């Protein structure tokens, strides 16, 4: 009987797609004739929004990879990709929902975004790039801690 009273929890991927992809090689074709020592930087951003259909959410994970030559600081390439997922999420309270959107959903999207980035770099004529796994739970906990610190500092003023 206790099982019947438990709310149904559902976290399902309904659709995955590349929402945006941009590849820039500003110094082509000369860049392919130079001996370069690339320094790679990775930028990560994500956002989510509730969709019109009940319990459906859209999560966008944006990765920006910039390769600059370590000696000249000139941009070798810049790749931006937005991997998007539509998720159906049922039976979670607000705190659990935020955790699911910011951790679970981004963790699902990241391997797809990573593959899109690596493929785009290879298709642009450069050696493939392996992006390390990311602990989105740790990033989310850092974000919550920063928000708490900001709120605490705002309350002291």
From Swiss-Prot:
Show the GO cellular component annotation of the record: cytoplasm
What's any GO biological process attached to this entry?
Answer: protein folding
Q: What is this protein called?
A: Protein-export protein SecB
Residue pairs linked by disulfide bridges in the UniProt entry: none
Q: Where in the cell is it found?
A: Cytoplasm
UniProt keyword Translocase, yes or no:
no
SUPFAM superfamilies per UniProt:
SecB-like
Quaternary structure annotation from Swiss-Prot or TrEMBL: Homotetramer, a dimer of dimers. One homotetramer interacts with 1 SecA dimer.
